[in-house]
């Protein structure tokens, strides 16, 4: 019986490694091909000129102004989208959990609704709105922050909702209220520190999604990283592929940080609190 279990365990281990190897080749081979393409000069020899230019910001800005404009615009869009999403979503989800539990399903439906709406449909609906946005706020690409908050909403909501589900929000709030804390104190000093990893997860997901968005920015005639890469591909395929590879690596890095922070938060929540032995009375 023990030998049968051992053989089954070995077969499962081999199967897992085969699956992991196949998936690794499937995902990493195109990345290696992109890297090889960006390091191949016109004479066929290996060169790092493309990557040296990519990290030399003044020279890159002078050589490829559309790309530099898109990078700056995307950084601003990432920052403002994350801030706007957290300011709108975190208090709303916490308040619904604490005071309006009957509206939880409705809020969940509204937050997940963008998953069913294609980006092109969003553009059709947002185009008249952005005509007024341009009239009042100008044609800055940072105004895409309002549009990007919609597609990132489902992912941010799921991350924050999972964090709230892992703690006893009601007990924490009732304990804080019994000690005289206001609702604002309960929200920002009691609940929020306990879902810090969930908030970071939501922020990382938003960064990855905003950096990869193309359709909305292109159809609304705004600039971002993906629009800059698309324009760059018409004049310099090597630099376009290099920037795409750098963006993919950045997104993978953010997802890796997401898994690390998420795993650390789960382990911290599962670790039992240390028990302090009571002193014996004399």
Pin down the residues of each PLM region.
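Transmembrane-helix boundary motif in ABC transporter permease subunits
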Residues: 2-8, 78-111, 124, 128-132, ...
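Short hydrophobic faces within alpha-helices
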Residues: 71, 96, 113, 160, ...
């Amino acid at each position: 019986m023990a030998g049968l279990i051992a053989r089954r365990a070995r077969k499962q281990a081999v199967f897992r490694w085969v699956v992991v190897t196949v998936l690794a080749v499937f995902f990493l081979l195109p990345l290696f091909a992109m890297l090889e393409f960006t390091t191949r000069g016109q004479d066929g020899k290996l060169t790092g000129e493309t990557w040296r230019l990519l990290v030399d910001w003044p020279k890159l800005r002078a050589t490829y102004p559309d790309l530099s404009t898109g990078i700056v615009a995307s950084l601003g869009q990432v920052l403002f989208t994350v801030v706007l999403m957290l300011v709108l979503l975190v208090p709303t989800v916490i308040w619904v959990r604490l005071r309006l539990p009957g509206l939880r399903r409705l809020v969940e439906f509204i937050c997940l609704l963008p998953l069913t709406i294609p980006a092109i449909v969003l553009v059709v609906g947002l185009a008249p709105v952005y005509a007024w946005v341009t009239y009042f706020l100008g044609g800055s690409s940072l105004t895409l922050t309002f549009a990007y908050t919609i597609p990132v909403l489902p992912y941010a909501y799921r991350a924050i909702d999972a964090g709230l589900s892992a703690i006893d929000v009601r007990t924490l709030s009732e304990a804080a209220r019994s000690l005289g804390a206001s609702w604002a104190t309960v929200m920002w000093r009691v609940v929020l520190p306990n879902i810090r990893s969930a908030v970071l997860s939501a922020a990382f997901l938003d960064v990855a999604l905003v950096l990869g968005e193309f359709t909305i920015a292109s159809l609304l005639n705004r600039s971002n990283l993906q629009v800059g890469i698309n324009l760059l591909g018409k004049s310099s395929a090597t630099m376009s592929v290099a920037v795409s590879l750098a963006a993919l690596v950045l997104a993978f890095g953010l997802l890796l940080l997401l898994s690390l922070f998420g795993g650390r938060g789960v382990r911290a929540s599962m670790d039992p609190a240390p028990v302090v032995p009571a002193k014996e009375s004399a």
